[in-house]
């Protein structure tokens, strides 16, 4: 059954346009509450945690959701602005029925969204989301006054999460002598991430820590690393750490201003665990993970498999394989031996631990990995065009793949949101990659 409201990462859209409107949010809270109470044990009181990022619309959506949950007889614990992975952690640690995050991650402030975590700190299953959607078809009601849900504020939510993050860093190590610039994207980590690194001994220079409700991800954070690069150079810092608006993505910068994306950091995490004798089995990347990273990880003597783009699919394949480490170039990095979901702060701590234990810089940890140039062309499509049925196009794709052999990779996929065909070619030569990509793209009939 196809879902009507839930996408790959919850429900998301522009504030003020359906479904990101108060009336629907109240219905959503009520529907989710009804599903939770149906699954609860007899006489068990359901309680959910609601966290949010720093968007001004968070207040509006939080109040609407709270009303819906209360009407369904579910207690609500409010923790204010906190990273998405912080909600996952607290939901599990406090033995709650579910966690709710109000955030649109790396999107601009005009957007917002809702996603749910299970009692175990995992993203909700498709079946649970379908059950919520089915309940949304019913009219909203209200339990008796005696059964109404109550609202509480969890005042020490940030402190609890900070301590959890610190607990994932090896106890025999510290960050003394390290000068870090931390960019929190004017988002949810503005009052958590700097404290984590400072309390572990680092000298911390913070940017992107002045949220006003409208400046989240605005020229800062993991999706706009230029500000971090400039600050690292200006301060003569050893390293820069950039998170996105809800702090589940990570990008890092070394002292020279070189940017390291999620692909490269994924290799660092995998190699460090292998060097420490940990049994990994393998690593999960995505369809877009650079071929050089795949080759380097396989060179460690472990497996490598690709999931569809999106941290949800990486997590699904990790669980399917029973593996621990996965991620994607955008900076979603999963360390399931540390947390149940992707966490930018915790991933940064794991990279810092690898640097400390090896007494090497990030560049030195990656000096044997040469990232392949990757060319991505977006070609506009006619509405009726089916590229998979185009014999001429597919013949050229096959020819390019044969020419590249094992020294390159071709990926063709239609955009899920726009009338575009994405043509990606990567190989050791940028010129070869560009020519190969053009030879395919030029055969696509455009409007």
Curated annotation (Swiss-Prot):
An example Gene Ontology CC term for this record: cytosol
The protein's enzyme class: isomerase
Enzymatic reactions: alpha-D-glucosamine 1-phosphate = D-glucosamine 6-phosphate
Cross-referenced InterPro entries: A-D-PHexomutase_a/b/a-I (IPR005844), A-D-PHexomutase_a/b/a-I/II/III (IPR016055), A-D-PHexomutase_a/b/a-II (IPR005845), A-D-PHexomutase_a/b/a-III (IPR005846), A-D-PHexomutase_C (IPR005843), A-D-PHexomutase_C_sf (IPR036900), A-D-PHexomutase_CS (IPR016066), Alpha-D-phosphohexomutase_SF (IPR005841)
The protein's Enzyme Commission number: 5.4.2.10
Disulfide bonding pattern of the chain: none
Keywords on record: Isomerase, Magnesium, Metal-binding, Phosphoprotein
Phosphoserine: modified positions: 105
Cofactor section: Mg(2+)
Residues annotated as the enzyme's active site: 105 (phosphoserine intermediate)
Description of post-translational modifications: Activated by phosphorylation.
Bilayer-spanning residue ranges: none
Protein name: Phosphoglucosamine mutase
Native species: Polynucleobacter asymbioticus (strain DSM 18221 / CIP 109841 / QLW-P1DMWA-1)
Phylogenetic classification of the source organism: Bacteria, Pseudomonadati, Pseudomonadota, Betaproteobacteria, Burkholderiales
């Amino acid at each position: 059954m196809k879902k009507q409201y839930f996408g790959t990462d919850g429900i998301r859209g522009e504030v003020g346009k359906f479904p990101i409107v108060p009336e629907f949010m109240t219905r959503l809270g009520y529907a989710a509450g009804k599903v939770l109470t149906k699954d609860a044990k007899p006489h068990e009181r359901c309680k959910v945690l609601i966290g949010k990022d720093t968007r001004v619309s968070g207040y509006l959506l939080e109040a609407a959701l709270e009303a819906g949950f209360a009407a369904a007889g579910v207690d609500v614990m409010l923790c204010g602005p906190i990273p998405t992975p912080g909600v996952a952690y607290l939901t599990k640690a406090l033995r709650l029925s579910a966690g709710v995050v109000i955030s649109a991650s790396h999107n601009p402030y005009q957007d917002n969204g809702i996603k749910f975590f299970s009692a175990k700190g995992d993203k909700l299953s498709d079946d649970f989301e379908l059950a919520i959607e089915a309940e949304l078809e019913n009219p909203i009601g209200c339990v008796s006054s005696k059964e109404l849900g109550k609202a509480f504020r969890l005042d020490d939510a940030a402190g609890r999460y900070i301590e959890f993050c610190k607990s994932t860093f090896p106890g025999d190590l510290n960050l003394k002598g390290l000068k870090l610039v931390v960019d929190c994207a004017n988002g949810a980590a503005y009052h958590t991430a700097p404290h984590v690194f400072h309390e572990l001994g680092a000298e911390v220079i913070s940017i992107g820590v002045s949220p006003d409700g409208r400046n989240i991800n605005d020229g800062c954070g993991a999706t706009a690393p230029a500000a971090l690069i400039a600050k690292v150079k200006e301060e003569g810092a050893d390293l820069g750490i950039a998170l996105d608006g809800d702090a589940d993505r990570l990008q890092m910068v070394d002292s020279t201003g070189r940017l390291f994306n999620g692909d490269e950091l994924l290799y660092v995490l995998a190699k460090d665990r292998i060097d420490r004798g940990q049994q990994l089995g393998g690593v999960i990347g995505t369809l877009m993970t650079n071929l050089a990273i795949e080759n380097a990880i396989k060179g460690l003597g472990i497996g490598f498999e690709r999931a569809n783009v999106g941290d949800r699919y990486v997590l699904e394949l990790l669980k399917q394989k029973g593996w621990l480490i996965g991620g994607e170039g955008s900076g979603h990095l999963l360390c399931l031996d540390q947390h149940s979901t992707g966490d930018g702060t915790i991933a940064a701590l794991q990279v810092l631990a690898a640097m400390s234990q090896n007494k090497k810089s990030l560049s030195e940890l990656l000096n044997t990995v040469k990232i392949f140039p990757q060319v991505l062309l977006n070609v506009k499509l006619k509405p009726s065009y089916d590229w998979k049925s185009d014999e001429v196009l597919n013949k050229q794709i096959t020819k390019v793949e044969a020419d590249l052999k094992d020294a390159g990779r071709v990926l063709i996929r239609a955009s899920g949101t726009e009338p575009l065909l994405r043509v990606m070619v990567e190989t050791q030569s940028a010129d070869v990659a560009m020519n190969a990509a053009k030879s395919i793209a030029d055969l696509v009939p455009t409007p």
